[in-house]
C-alpha cells in the first residue's frame, strides 16, 4: 500500500512569534525517587560506619548501586531518555552515555567521569576502597536530587496561543508509552492555525510533523484541547491537525531545553531554536 501523501505537514516556525505560553501541566510521579533516597541514605550510613568491615562496605556499595538503579528507572519511565536516538548516539544501550548527553550528570573532569562510571559498572566480588565508595555515594546523592528536580519541573503539556488571534492554538504533549519493560517517549502536536502557515511539501525553517490527521469539526468537538474552537473551521482559512514529531534530534533538543534550567526552559522564544536545523 502506498504512503499517504498527507501523512506529513510542515508548520511555519513564525507561528510561535508573538505567542504567549500557558496551560502547562505536570503530572509526573516521583514516588520512586523517595525510595531511591531511602536506599541511598541507608547505604551511605552503612559505608560511613563500616569500620573496615569489608562485608558491611560491600553491603553499602551494592545498596548504592541499587539506589542508582531505582532512580534511573524513574527517569526512564518518565522521560525515556535512553530511547531517544539522537545524532551521535553510539550504542543502543549505554545509559551512562545518555545521562552525559542530556547533562543529567555533570563531572568536573573526564578522569572523574570514567572513575564514577567504572564504580557503577563494578562487578568484582570485593568492593572498591572506602574512599571510592564515599565518592560514589556523593555522586549518587547528587544524581537523585537532580532527577527529582527534573521530574518536578518537566512540563508534559504546553500551549502556545495568540491574544490577537483566538483561533490560533498549538499544543505539545510529551507522552510516555510502555512496551514490555521499556518506555518510549512521544512528542505529539495538536494545532489550529491559519492555512497559510502550513505546507504539505518540505520547506526550510518549517517544523516537520509526521503521521498527521487533519481534524474536521466533529474531530475538534471530541478533542481534548480544541473542543471550544470547533466553530473556527467555519472559516476556510483555518486548519486543525494532530500529529507527532518523529525527528529524534528535535525530540532531544526539546527535552534538553525542558530539563536544564540554564537553557531557560521552553517558551515562545526558545521553542523556535528547537526546530532550527542550523
What are these regions (language model features)?
Residues 76-106:
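Short, charged amphipathic alpha-helical segments flanked by flexible coils
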Amino acid at each position: 500500500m502506498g504512503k499517504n501523501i498527507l501523512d506529513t505537514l510542515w508548520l511555519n516556525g513564525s507561528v510561535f512569534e508573538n505567542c504567549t505560553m500557558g496551560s502547562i501541566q505536570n503530572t509526573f510521579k516521583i514516588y520512586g525517587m523517595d525510595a531511591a533516597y531511602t536506599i541511598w541514605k541507608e547505604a551511605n550510613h552503612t559505608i560511613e560506619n563500616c569500620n573496615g568491615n569489608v562485608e558491611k562496605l560491600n553491603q553499602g556499595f551494592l545498596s548504592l548501586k541499587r539506589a542508582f538503579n531505582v532512580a534511573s528507572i524513574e527517569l526512564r519511565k518518565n522521560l525515556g531518555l535512553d530511547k531517544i536516538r539522537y545524532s551521535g548516539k553510539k550504542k543502543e544501550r549505554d545509559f551512562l552515555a545518555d545521562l552525559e548527553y542530556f547533562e543529567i550528570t555533570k563531572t568536573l573532569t573526564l578522569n572523574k567521569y570514567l572513575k564514577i562510571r567504572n564504580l557503577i559498572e563494578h562487578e568484582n566480588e570485593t568492593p572498591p576502597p572506602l574512599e571510592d565508595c564515599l565518592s560514589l555515594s556523593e555522586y549518587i546523592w547528587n544524581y537523585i536530587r537532580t532527577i527529582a528536580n527534573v521530574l518536578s519541573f518537566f512540563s508534559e503539556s504546553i500551549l502556545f496561543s495568540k491574544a490577537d488571534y483566538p483561533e490560533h492554538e498549538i499544543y505539545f504533549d510529551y507522552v510516555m508509552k510502555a512496551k514490555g519493560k521499556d518506555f518510549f517517549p512521544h512528542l505529539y502536536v495538536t494545532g489550529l492555525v491559519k492555512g497559510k502557515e502550513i505546507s504539505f511539501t518540505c520547506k526550510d525553517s518549517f517544523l516537520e510533523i509526521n503521521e498527521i490527521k487533519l481534524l474536521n469539526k466533529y474531530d475538534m468537538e471530541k478533542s481534548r484541547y480544541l473542543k471550544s474552537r470547533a466553530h473556527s473551521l467555519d472559516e476556510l482559512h483555518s486548519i486543525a491537525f494532530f500529529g507527532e514529531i518523529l525527528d529524534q534530534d528535535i525530540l532531544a533538543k526539546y527535552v534538553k531545553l525542558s530539563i536544564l534550567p540554564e537553557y531557560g526552559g521552553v517558551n515562545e522564544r526558545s521553542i523556535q531554536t528547537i526546530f532550527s536545523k542550523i
